[in-house]
């Protein structure tokens, strides 16, 4: 793999280790998972927790956001799939600005676009198409973001 991040290197190492020492294991590659309880310091977490968010590269970085319910279905699928490595990924890429604008529709937020591409940013997320993609009808980002805010409304969580 061609990665420079410690996260990417550790994922690759884990896959290699499993292929040598645990032949029956299925490695699951998850891509930009989001849902009602976002992990700290992810894009969705910043959008939900902050009033002002800065998007580098003018929000044009491209990502494949995968809703958490789809990840759960994919992990269940992985249990008996007899494949060494699979992708659990919504392969409909969107810009980070588009994703942020979906959140902004439901929550007041100021989005600052910064015209700076940082050295460690990947402009476009790459999904290795040679790795098997779990066949699901993945949740669109529009529907996923709506689900998040419907859940918050149901639980009476406001800003």
List the model feature ranges, each with a label.
Residues 2-3, 40:
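Active-site loop immediately N-terminal to the catalytic Tyr-X3-Lys motif
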């Amino acid at each position: 793999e061609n990665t420079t991040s410690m996260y990417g290197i550790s994922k690759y190492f884990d896959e290699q280790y499993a292929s040598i020492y645990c032949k029956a294991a299925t490695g699951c590659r998850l891509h930009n998972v989001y849902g009602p309880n976002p992990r700290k310091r992810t894009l969705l977490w910043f959008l939900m927790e902050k009033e002002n968010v800065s998007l580098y590269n003018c929000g044009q970085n491209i990502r494949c956001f995968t809703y958490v319910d789809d990840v759960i279905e994919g992990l269940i699928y992985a249990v008996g799939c007899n494949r060494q490595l699979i992708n659990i990924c919504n392969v409909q890429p969107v810009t980070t600005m588009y994703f942020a604008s979906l959140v902004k529709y439901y929550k007041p937020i100021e989005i600052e676009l910064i015209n700076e591409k940082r050295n460690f940013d990947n402009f476009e997320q790459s999904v290795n198409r040679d790795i098997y993609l779990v066949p699901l009808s993945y949740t669109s980002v529009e529907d996923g973001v709506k689900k998040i805010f419907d859940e918050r409304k149901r639980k009476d969580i406001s800003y």
